[in-house]
């Protein structure tokens, strides 16, 4: 058989959310920043994303990242995040997955009891620390990018749920944060269809009404998803949240960048003190922890540096081929 492309991946999940790491088979990516490399991929090789994220190799809620060379002196590697709709600016669960794989598979020099991993992402440089006992990787904590409330108490009108009020905050991506209780939206698997409809309608309305732009990275200029918070199932958790992002994807994890934005939102509203920990529960009951490390500014705006902690596990290795004779080789989505 004639194979037009072969791609190798490491399959990881973070709190239940898939993350497919592409380790080989990509074309050489031109550009001296991750954002420019991402732009080249989007224009010249987007079929790779479709092949790996869409069915039959992936599914409507698939997520992944392409390894690339670092662009800053303190980074071990760079990453370009991909999903069903396109490309994202940040992915906290992806950072945790990448850091776990880097330590488990020896991509970085490992030290006990903790190993540092530096990652260049579209949103900037991210530093992670992985617990390492000499045999196994444990929980990962990463220093998030500066995070902040962009706009408070904004309202959007939706077709199915009426007026929805919340905050737009940034934790590596812009999200619309809303309380699900007034809309009878528990963060449970049984409510996932209503959560998807709600999140998609709010995201569309917010993007139409409230233009956003990162003060220092103008390429980050859209609301990536809706984060719906409600009561957790575990009394030890602070809250549960469900992130509906991209093209109606549902995050199985508590959302890493979303946790960073939530920490900033709560801190800047006086609802989370320095030294306090947000225990953030996902739709499947897994947990990330978030806390404020320090205050900072971004383009003159008050912001904080959050730390986010979670765990990931390698669940497989794969080799994928692209066969141009296959009419579905670049994938499809039923939903």
UniProtKB/Swiss-Prot annotation:
Its EC number is 5.1.1.-. It comes from the Bacteria. The active site is at residue 91. Belongs to the proline racemase family. Keywords: Isomerase. Catalyzes the epimerization of trans-3-hydroxy-L-proline (t3LHyp) to cis-3-hydroxy-D-proline (c3DHyp) in vitro. Can also catalyze the epimerization of trans-4-hydroxy-L-proline (t3LHyp) to cis-4-hydroxy-D-proline (c4DHyp), albeit with 3.6-fold lower efficiency. Displays no proline racemase activity. This is 3-hydroxyproline 2-epimerase. Gene3D superfamilies: Diaminopimelate Epimerase, Chain A, domain 1. InterPro entries: Hydroxyproline_Metab_Enz (IPR053425), Pro_racemase_fam (IPR008794). PANTHER family: TRANS-3-HYDROXY-L-PROLINE DEHYDRATASE. One of its GO terms (molecular function) is 4-hydroxyproline epimerase activity. It catalyses: trans-3-hydroxy-L-proline = cis-3-hydroxy-D-proline; trans-4-hydroxy-L-proline = cis-4-hydroxy-D-proline. Substrate binds at residues 92-93, 251, 256-257.
